[in-house]
Amino acid sequence: MKTLLVLRISTVILVVLVIQKSYADILECDYFDTVDISAAQKLQNGSYLFEGLLVPAILTGEYDFRILPDDSKQKVARHIRGCVCKLKPCVRFCCPHDHIMDNGVCYDNMSDEELAELDPFLNVTLDDGSVSRRHFKNELIVQWDLPMPCDGMFYLDNREEQDKYTLFENGTFFRHFDRVTLRKREYCLQHLTFADGNATSIRIAPHNCLIVPSITGQTVVMISSLICMVLTIAVYLFVKKLQNLHGKCFICYMVCLFMGYLFLLLDLWQISISFCKPAGFLGYFFVMAAFFWLSVISLHLWNTFRGSSHKANRFLFEHRFLAYNTYAWGMAVVLTGITVLADNIVENQDWNPRVGHEGHCWIYTQAWSAMLYFYGPMVFLIAFNITMFILTAKRILGVKKDIQNFAHRQERKQKLNSDKQTYTFFLRLFIIMGLSWSLEIGSYFSQSNQTWANVFLVADYLNWSQGIIIFILFVLKRSTWRLLQESIRGEGEEVNNSEEEISLENTTTRNVLL
């Protein structure tokens, strides 16, 4: 009985060892940092001598699979791999080092003339930030047996400004035109023939696959957001009591936001590609108009509590909405006109907005020009809104103090509380919108850092869901819901102009106290 038990335990141990040997991943070594060293000389201590490099036994393993770019495993013949990239910098090739690539296909046995014509040097950015020019074969380990990144690849010609790239010592690859960092499984290098006028040259060129992010999440959020915007606009148009000056400005803001996001969605679905530039400029116009309407709201709130002479205030109230329209739409037209002009006459790519560039029907947000034409005005308007809301808050405190020292304070206190609620809701709107766009600006500055770019992805989702947030804040609140029910029953059709009243009351209060 004891002998049988020992035999069973031995069998289990043997099976475990066999399985472990079959899938002998090298400890703390990425598969894409290994090479096949089966043909290398094996020494008595278990280490291998590979291309003049001593690979210790602890950095070797027997594999009967290979890992594909999607992390799945493919069964292959058993072979020995070594984690040589921990010992010496590696360069990831698509095919063996003496092959040349043409239209994504590797061709073997380069001729002596082609080998003589080949430029064998690569610029490698070291860990300390310096750039070293290295011979691909003599100073680096060539990894050529890794699976191809994808079926269809495109190459980069670093003679072109838009095709610049950076190859790092640890094997990562940074593509400049879309500021994307690629791992070894997502790109490879190979010799390629380039035309140089009437002559040709052979150089090492990177071949990689575009990282196409899933648009499902963005699509769902943006469609939901657009639906909520339509519902919000409909409620404010249906309920007469909401159509005071605040409400009219808010409706204009929502219309601009809806149109801006609609053009973003059309760009996301590539629907606007047939009228790309006009779609890009129209989308830009409505987004900037939305920002100007948000500044109108903050300015109007401040003016509501500021107070002025009775006649002047009455005159301004009757014509203020026209003035606000002239300002918001006019400034958006001016900025859009400047952007259109710059897009057509500015030759320097760093100063050109490049609307419709790289297949996106929007202003090009990967370059410094985006700060000049898009994020710069955005920062200025956010700063203006912050200033207005702070000044309004100070004025509310001042009016509250005045009311405490004035007769009939209960009636005026009710009006103040009503406008304080209006201020609070619009302040909440600005905080949500200002925060989301501020994070968007942070996302713009962090594009070169993939880690921070992933963090700021939260800002993108917050931005895309603005319509949902506004619907919750402005329509699903109890007071709006009550007004909607009254309007459905045909009650209370009078427009609420309390913002004018509080301004006039505050002015009278101030004059009496003086």
UniProtKB/Swiss-Prot annotation:
Record-level GO BP terms: cell surface receptor signaling pathway; determination of adult lifespan; G protein-coupled receptor signaling pathway; response to heat; response to paraquat; response to reactive oxygen species; response to starvation; synaptic vesicle exocytosis
Transmembrane regions: 219-239, 249-269, 279-299, 321-341, 371-391, 425-445, 455-475
A Pfam family this chain is assigned to: Methuselah_N
Compartment list: Cell membrane
Residue spans, topological domain Extracellular: 25-218, 270-278, 342-370, 446-454
Main localization category: membrane
Observed effect of gene inactivation: Increase in average life-span and enhanced resistance to various forms of stress, including starvation, high temperature and dietary paraquat, a free-radical generator.
Outcome of substituting residue 407 to V: In strain: ZIM(H)23
Cystine residue pairs: 29-83, 85-90, 94-188, 95-106, 150-209
Signal sequence range: 1-24
Membrane association type: Multi-pass membrane protein
PROSITE patterns xref list: G_PROTEIN_RECEP_F2_4 (PS50261)
Gene3D superfamilies the record matches: 2.30.160.11, Methuselah ectodomain, domain 2, Rhodopsin 7-helix transmembrane proteins
An example Gene Ontology CC term for this record: membrane
Residue intervals on the Cytoplasmic side: 240-248, 300-320, 392-424, 476-514
Keywords per UniProt: Cell membrane, Disulfide bond, Exocytosis, G-protein coupled receptor, Glycoprotein, Membrane, Neurotransmitter transport, Receptor, Signal, Transducer, Transmembrane, Transmembrane helix, Transport
GO molecular function: G protein-coupled peptide receptor activity; G protein-coupled receptor activity; peptide binding
Glycosylation sites per record: 45, 109, 123, 170, 198, 449
Additional information: Agonists of mth share minimal sequence homology, suggesting a remarkable promiscuity of mth for activation.
Function of the molecule: Involved in biological aging and stress response. Essential for adult survival. Required in the presynaptic motor neuron to up-regulate neurotransmitter exocytosis at larval glutamatergic neuromuscular junctions (NMJs). Regulates a step associated with docking and clustering of vesicles at release sites. SP/Acp70A and sun are agonists that activate mth in vitro.
Recorded family membership: Belongs to the G-protein coupled receptor 2 family. Mth subfamily.
Subunit details: Homodimer.
Official protein name in the record: G-protein coupled receptor Mth
UniProt organism field: Drosophila melanogaster (Fruit fly)
